[in-house]
């Protein structure tokens, strides 16, 4: 089944911050657009949806604009560079992060979740009768990295909006 993008702002079923057309337009101005244009539309859509899911694993300042919205943006009650976030649009840096992460995921589908651990370089450790053999080139099945560890450049796009890293247990304190 072909992937379908829903980029409705504050949408209950939204699964992307951008449309495929917006992403294609962005990469038309990119120095290395071939790493995007060599993908099928379905691969691009799947990568955009996946990028949104990973971006939404992070914790952000402010509040969702609508309790029923599926995605973490748009947000309000927070300013970046003295400008209040608006409920009527997605910040450009969030879109840029999605474009670049989608391209990265389209070109390395195992970068975050790892491979199954069946291929690659194996190491063996032996202690008496105990022997352990493991793969050094991949992660075990089900293992998930912090998105910012895998793609630290995302911090440049998302840092101004983030409360903490992925799965952060930090709490916002309001004095007054």
What are these regions (language model features)?
Residues 1-176:
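Divalent metal-cofactor coordination and adjacent catalytic microenvironments
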């Amino acid at each position: 089944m072909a992937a379908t993008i829903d980029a409705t702002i504050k949408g209950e079923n939204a699964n992307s911050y951008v449309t495929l057309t917006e992403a294609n337009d962005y990469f038309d101005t990119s120095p290395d657009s071939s790493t995007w244009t060599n993908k099928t539309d379905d691969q691009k859509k799947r990568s955009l949806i996946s990028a949104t899911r990973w971006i939404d694993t992070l914790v952000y300042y402010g509040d969702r604009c609508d309790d029923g919205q599926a995605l973490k943006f748009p947000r309000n009650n927070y300013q970046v560079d003295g400008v209040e976030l608006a409920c009527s649009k997605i910040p450009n840096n969030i879109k840029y992060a999605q474009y670049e992460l989608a391209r990265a995921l389209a070109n390395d589908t195992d970068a975050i979740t790892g491979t199954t651990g069946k291929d690659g370089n194996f190491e063996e450790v032996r202690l008496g009768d105990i022997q352990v053999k493991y793969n050094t080139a991949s992660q075990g099945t089900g293992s998930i990295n912090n998105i910012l560890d895998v793609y630290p450049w995302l911090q440049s796009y998302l840092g101004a909006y983030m409360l903490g890293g992925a799965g952060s247990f930090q709490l916002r304190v309001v004095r007054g």
